[in-house]
């Protein structure tokens, strides 16, 4: 059985259209015109136990709305989602004991309490037995390295410390599923690496199923077993990082370093489809569709036109592929 099961999930919002001006405002108040906005459209996917799924899309794609339905905050218009065999909107008090949630821009910690006291309060909220609580704290201290600031008030913690503390809070009751929304937002490189290592260790040691939303594509490459991409509430890709690169990473770039003093123009590649040529001084970059053109032919032609000091092939990385998706180029 899948840990996360989503079938034909749909969420519509009804909004009032307001006309401009005083008359328009009065007319809208007396005779409001309603429009239905489809935020999530017929989403279907499953996540098996222990998988880390990168749930990604541009701003406004429907990610947050989907997460709110999966966590039980919003009720679907139609379709359903089931987490660990439970419907999130049914008996939420019991359901939330199966999940942990971290929102990168919001904290679940109490601002004026010491971090250790915050965990004690959460222990009571989640009915965590004393023996399990101490065992969990030992594990989370080791993985997330909380010991240096666990006695400090939450308001004094740095952003990186607070994020580690929030992840620990979400894992205190040993949830089966962890929802991470932008867990590395605003963090410096070294802190991001520490957070990623901690997430990987927790996933491997406890088989925690993780659904990750992020705009940091390094998170996706380093953490995710699979990517589920949506746009305008609909699925546009479901597969592994390697499948994404294989299917959509056909654009490659040949970068040439020219011997100085060559000022003649490039003529062979002008106007060719799926190829762009950019020359800046002694640097010549040719981007091309590798399913349409052979790199060996391009190199041969360029060597006949110019004296070359060096060259290298650059594959399209995941960040560029997803950027092209967002721009509707793929």
Task: Indicate residue ranges for each PLM-predicted region.
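ABC transporter nucleotide-binding domain
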Residues: 196-289
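Conserved ABC ATPase "signature" region
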Residues: 21-29, 120, 124, 131-149
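Catalytic Walker B motif of ABC-type/P-loop ATPase nucleotide-binding domains
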Residues: 178-182
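Conserved catalytic motifs of ABC-family nucleotide-binding domains
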Residues: 174
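Conserved ABC transporter NBD signature motif
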Residues: 79-90, 95-96
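Conserved ABC ATPase signature
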Residues: 112, 153-157
